[in-house]
Amino acid sequence: MPDFFSFINSVLWGSVMIYLLFGAGCWFTFRTGFVQFRYIRQFGKSLKNSIHPQPGGLTSFQSLCTSLAARVGSGNLAGVALAITAGGPGAVFWMWVAAFIGMATSFAECSLAQLYKERDVNGQFRGGPAWYMARGLGMRWMGVLFAVFLLIAYGIIFSGVQANAVARALSFSFDFPPLVTGIILAVFTLLAITRGLHGVARLMQGFVPLMAIIWVLTSLVICVMNIGQLPHVIWSIFESAFGWQEAAGGAAGYTLSQAITNGFQRSMFSNEAGMGSTPNAAAAAASWPPHPAAQGIVQMIGIFIDTLVICTASAMLILLAGNGTTYMPLEGIQLIQKAMRVLMGSWGAEFVTLVVILFAFSSIVANYIYAENNLFFLRLNNPKAIWCLRICTFATVIGGTLLSLPLMWQLADIIMACMAITNLTAILLLSPVVHTIASDYLRQRKLGVRPVFDPLRYPDIGRQLSPDAWDDVSQE
């Protein structure tokens, strides 16, 4: 069975996904007028606006923190370690490339989710890829297919991956039994997810910034302490990225395809650009200024923080301690624990364990929120279905601590590809709408007015929208 999963992954990620992700990212970069570069200087202002409260939804900052909670999981630690061991230091460079290109894709999918959102019976905004497939494309069947993929991925597999990382970290540092880890983590997860969307969002708006700051500041201090090695580390990234590094002295050599494949894989698992997960959080926000593009820009910040800041910090720590092959017998999170012991002494692994617990717990909780959101699209938002999903998540967290790491990641990669292919197909078909959103936002900014989306200006789009999603702002 592992060989079968490995074959499927090699087909999907050896060619199909790389070309699709790269092509979609380049296409949306062009169609949006290089949106990730145009507004990068506005990230600070966008963050300031994101705390502006609006009725009927989360603040943009709460939405960003919820999406970051899902992004900033063990993929930022274990995933980076796996990328370096499988693709060499050059995989880090291709993670950066994938992140910059992915910003445009994220802008597109999150803007569409915000545009096609609707209110549930409680007045809370709901939306995501399933909604823009149904409303924007008129293909509800496609939305149902995507929602099922997401329920499998976020309700089951990805939470197991995160739990696996916690179990391995605790076992490596304290020889803690994986089953006990799974039970304790599952109980805390159940307590958190019963708080609902708003409760989780309030929890994450304080939790996520704190844990990110702890990890990044620690990494910066270690980099400063080892500043003499940084030029060599940075050169090794670029040298390996383009296949210049030859196998010599018994060390493993890495091909260009290995670096690109692993860089794109791990970048996508970490920042989720194009996968269709983040739009579920983006749609829940009452955007400020009241324009779909404003939420798209806020969610681009999430990719910047996730990959270009947090993942880079993890990569630097691993490469400062060795070249990624030094601890080849170790897998994933254990590799970065070993690296931190080299850099920080005996308590380095224990520190990583604490960070992994924080990252993975927040990711598991946010993963559940995404899955529950899609129950609403499938019209299964009744107490029985919701509790069934909660029990599945509870069981998956326990089960994930007992499975092997390679098998968990292979399953994650396959379902991630299925989600991405479905979502990217939809947003590429909706690219004229993305172009309209981006152009309308830019037009109003050039006029010096606060961007406000008016569906009456675009009647073809307006007819596709939920009648109560944008009526209020169109009259401002």
Swiss-Prot record:
Domain of life: Bacteria
Listed PROSITE patterns: NA_ALANINE_SYMP
GO molecular function terms attached to this record: amino acid:sodium symporter activity
Keyword Metal-binding: no
Location in or out of the cell: Cell inner membrane
Gene Ontology cellular component terms for the protein in this record: plasma membrane
Protein name: Uncharacterized transporter YaaJ
